[in-house]
């Protein structure tokens, strides 16, 4: 919540200084005044249950801090809802996007001028100094004190609401689906009184995805390798291969399957070159994360594994934010379907 109190509440407090009845009636009067002020704002109050924490909003936040979390879901959702002016500090950026102008819009947002910690995110003291009224984190990691971050309770004490994105409560995003992108849009739509806009975005995405899925229905489902370009997450040669999560839902809607879905119980697989070479890969999806040329990385992989059907047919696509939690999953579904089933488009 904003640290600014409603005008009606402030006025009630001022009146208490000059009346003799305030000693007994301050609580009642203040509550009534706050209820009156809240009633004057259509769409509020809004209450969200988020990872076991109840968050109540009596007005739209105006000092939002978006934590990094190796995500662009939260900042992209805010921009899709036309809320860029509410952001006082954003740490998210992929440096590219399937949505024209989005990468530039993200770059233009303020970063708060803070010095980031070793996790490339906003440390506790700097966060408090930003005076946020809402802090967004893609997982609960961003509110873990042992990681050097301000906790949700500490932020509540300084008047800030907090929000962990869908499936991020336990830091396990392996069950994430496209529906979670819609949940994020809906939640932010409610918080900022932009529900109508959120529902329009969701309806358009659902329509696009349904149209693509209808076209590829009944087609053979190629086996697809999805991985991040030039990124190391483990000790093996290929540690950023996608195994589970929203990526698989996108592949399914596009008429494909994940070639490495069984390689790990978590979101990512950490595999040797030999294991990768022994797997049939019909198509390749490379996700660019601050990589200026993920397509070059894709071509390099195809040369490295010429036995793949993907290499023989030069079947690949380079994507970025549309493959992750966020408002643009329909773009990834479309582009992957066009790659996998060119004869149907």
Predicted regions mapped to residue ranges:
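Bacterial Sec-exported substrate-binding components of ABC uptake systems
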Residues: 2-77, 190-228, 280, 288, ...
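Short helix-initiation/N-cap motifs at beta->coil->alpha
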Residues: 50-52, 114-123, 264-273
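Short, solvent-exposed loop/turn elements at domain surfaces
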Residues: 55-57, 72-78, 96-99, 233-237, ...
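A short, structured surface patch at a secondary-structure boundary
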Residues: 66-130, 134, 139-143
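Extracytoplasmic ligand-binding site segments that recognize negatively charged/polar headgroups
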Residues: 95-98, 141-150, 163-187, 219-246, ...
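Short helices/loops that flank or line small-molecule/ion binding pockets
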Residues: 123-134, 149, 270-280
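Structured C-terminal subdomain patch of bacterial secreted/periplasmic proteins
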Residues: 175-184, 263, 275-279, 283-345
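Alpha-helical, coiled-coil/dimerization segments enriched in small aliphatic residues
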Residues: 237-268
């Amino acid at each position: 919540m904003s640290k600014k109190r409603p005008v009606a509440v402030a006025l009630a407090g001022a009146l208490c200084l000059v009346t003799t009845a305030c000693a007994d009636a301050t609580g009642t009067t203040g509550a009534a005044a706050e209820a009156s002020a809240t009633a004057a704002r259509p769409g509020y109050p809004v209450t969200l249950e988020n990872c076991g924490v109840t968050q109540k909003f009596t007005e739209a936040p105006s000092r939002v801090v978006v934590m990094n979390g190796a995500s662009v879901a939260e900042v992209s959702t805010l921009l899709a809802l036309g809320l860029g002016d509410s952001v006082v500090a954003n740490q998210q950026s992929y440096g590219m996007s399937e949505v024209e102008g989005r990468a530039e819009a993200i770059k233009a947002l303020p970063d708060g001028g803070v010095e980031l910690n070793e996790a490339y995110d906003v440390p506790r003291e700097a966060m408090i100094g930003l005076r946020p009224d809402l802090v967004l984190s893609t997982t609960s990691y961003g509110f873990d004190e042992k990681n050097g971050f301000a906790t949700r309770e500490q932020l509540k004490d300084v008047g800030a609401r907090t929000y962990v994105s869908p499936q991020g409560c336990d830091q396990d995003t392996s069950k994430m689906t496209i529906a979670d992108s819609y949940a994020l849009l809906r939640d932010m739509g409610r918080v900022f009184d932009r529900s109508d806009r959120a529902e329009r975005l969701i309806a358009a995405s659902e329509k696009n995805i349904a149209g693509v899925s209808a076209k590829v229905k009944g087609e053979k489902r190629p086996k697809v390798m999805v991985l991040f370009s030039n990124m190391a997450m483990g000790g093996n040669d290929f540690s950023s291969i996608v195994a589970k999560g929203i990526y698989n839902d996108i592949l399914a809607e596009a008429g494909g399957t994940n070639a490495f879905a069984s390689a790990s119980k978590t979101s990512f697989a950490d595999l040797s070159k030999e294991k990768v070479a022994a797997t049939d890969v019909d198509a390749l999806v490379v996700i660019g994360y601050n990589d200026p040329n993920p397509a070059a990385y894709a071509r390099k992989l195809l040369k490295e594994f010429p036995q793949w059907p993907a290499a023989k047919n030069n079947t690949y696509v380079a994507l970025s934010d549309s493959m992750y939690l966020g408002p643009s999953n329909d773009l990834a579904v479309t582009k992957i379907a066009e790659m996998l089933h060119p004869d149907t488009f």
